[in-house]
Amino acid sequence: ASDVFDHQSPNADEVAFAKNVMGYAWGGNQASCTGEVYTIPTAVKQIPGYTDIKYNNELSNKVYCVESPNSIFASDKLSMPFMRYTENNRNAGIVSRREGYRTAVLGFPFETIVSREVRDLLMKQILDFFASEN
């Protein structure tokens, strides 16, 4: 998420794409130290909330370490947070219902979710949201 915003002079087209197409705005780096997030109840019924998720924030031989996760915000009324960092309740994930498509953006790499079962569940929920009519 920070690749677009975290520059001395962010590219205006990239910022507009993130906000107007993807539905998110950057909230800052180093959003969490614990590597723990949770989903929250929203109007998106496919992602019901109350799922605790751990992403890798330590050195590991299985997956790389997330050293500086991002906090992100919904950029408009079409977007909403669906995930927060456990330690401070900053937004860790945003979903968006756009005209003709859906988006989901995380403040950390999806592949660093430690539990395969939780990773599979979240992917299913996101894909169900993408396929939904409402």
Predicted regions and their residues:
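P/S/T/G-enriched low-complexity
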Residues: 39, 66-67, 128
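Residue-level preference for alpha-helix termini and adjacent loops
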Residues: 4, 49, 63-65, 72, ...
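Alpha-helix initiation/capping motif
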Residues: 42-48, 68, 75, 98, ...
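Extracellular ligand-binding/catalytic regions of CAZymes and related secreted enzymes
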Residues: 9-32, 75-80, 86-134
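Long, C-terminal catalytic modules of enzymes
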Residues: 52-63, 68-70, 76-84, 92-98
